[in-house]
Design a protein with these regions (language model features):
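Cytosolic regulatory regions built on CNB/CRP/Popeye-like sensor folds
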Residues: 1-365
Length: 365
């Protein structure tokens, strides 16, 4: 993924990073980011190789079961190797996030470390920089999640549903004007029970927001290559699929074209009569290209949801769990991943109000 940053960042973005950041040499074997501990900087790997791994689960039965199922070991499982051009820091521009993986130098490496405080300030003040970095982050995180699934096995797809309710985050982050544009640019359509909205392995042509009803996500059990699966429908055959999640109102599907991800490996189907708002891929792509403030908000949403998806897999398998359970003693100095802050509760109210406003706007049009 070394070309992502060069492709997505501008010359002024790179100049600012070089001026603000500090080059650091990392000895082979040294831990750069430790799972569950705060990150103070964004790291760009300039030279060398980094290893991304999961710490050993604390006797979690689900983690043991999946490790056995996929034929792997539980201790310090390798999930990715990063080369020059990759970026790590687990979205350091979100101060409530703790790393879900450990990153250490596999060989002697050189990184550019950009302090979190300066980065957060830059993201607020420079919309163009924010749009570029959030998009690059989303692309890299999408690739990282794909690597995790490939390393741990496709059985982990069932665990990859974000812990953040998408409706709560998406509609809290977007502006009223953004939502108004989505309504105007999109088309509301009814998806009858049993209708496939997105076929796994096939190109995605629109971003879909579920307004009413329920959709299922199903993974194909066909082990043929993606091209063979994509054209199998021409032969009139259907490959067996296994449902692993259900979507409800406010959830989105179809974001893969905007982060240069391959066509999704799962299919999306209506399990009851449903209504969706569909924004054509070409219209949204044009909007993202010409409206930088909107692009910054949109790609930030995708980056956070992808990071949360990665955390969902790791946490569900029991790797470095930092969530609070009933009857557990609370450590006031510890941050728990399922702890509800006052800011989060305020976001919930705001997101709900905006989603209801969007529904009313659609009904009037």
């Amino acid at each position: 993924m070394r070309e992502v940053l060069l492709k997505e960042l501008s010359n002024s973005d790179i100049d600012w990073m070089l001026t603000t950041g500090t080059k650091e040499e990392i000895a082979a074997g040294k831990v750069l980011i430790r799972q569950g501990e705060p990150v103070t900087a964004l790291y760009i790997l300039l030279d060398g190789e980094l290893l991304v791994s999961l710490s050993q689960p604390d006797n979690n039965p689900l983690g043991r079961a999946f490790a056995a199922l996929e034929g792997g070991e539980m201790s310090g499982r390798e999930i990715a190797r990063l080369s020059s051009g990759d970026m790590v820091g687990e979205i350091p521009f979100l101060d409530t996030y703790l790393p879900s993986t450990t990153v250490k130098a596999l060989t002697k490496s050189v990184v550019l470390a950009i302090p979190q405080q300066q980065l957060a300030k830059k993201l607020k003040e420079d919309i163009s920089f924010a749009a570029h970095l959030y998009r690059a982050s989303a692309i890299l995180l999408s690739d990282r999640v794909e690597q995790i699934v490939n390393q741990l096995g496709h059985s982990t797809l069932v665990l990859s549903q974000p812990k953040l309710r998408e409706i709560l985050f998406i509609f809290a982050e977007l502006r009223d004007s953004d939502i108004d544009w989505l309504v105007v640019a999109g088309t509301v359509s009814k998806i009858s029970t049993g209708t496939v909205l997105i076929q796994g392995g096939r190109p995605v042509e629109a971003l879909h927001i579920l307004l009413e009803g329920k959709l299922t996500l199903s993974a194909s059990e066909d082990d043929r290559n993606p091209l063979a699966r994509a054209f199998s429908s021409l032969e009139g055959g259907e490959s067996p699929e296994r449902e692993f999640a259900r979507l409800s109102r406010g959830d989105i599907v179809g974001e893969s074209p905007f982060i240069e991800a391959p066509p999704p490996s799962f299919s999306v189907k209506a399990v009851e009569d449903s209504w969706v708002l569909s924004i054509p891929q070409w219209r949204l792509a044009a909007k993202l290209l010409h409206d930088l403030p909107f692009a910054a908000r949109f790609y930030r949403v995708l980056a956070v949801l992808l990071a949360d998806k990665q955390r969902a897999i790791v946490s569900s398998l029991g790797y470095g769990r930092l969530s609070y359970s009933k009857d557990q003693s609370l450590d006031e100095s510890q941050q728990y991943e399922n702890e509800l802050s006052s800011d989060f509760l305020a976001q919930v109210a705001l997101a709900g109000a905006r989603f209801d406003w969007m529904l009313k706007r659609i009904r009037r049009s």
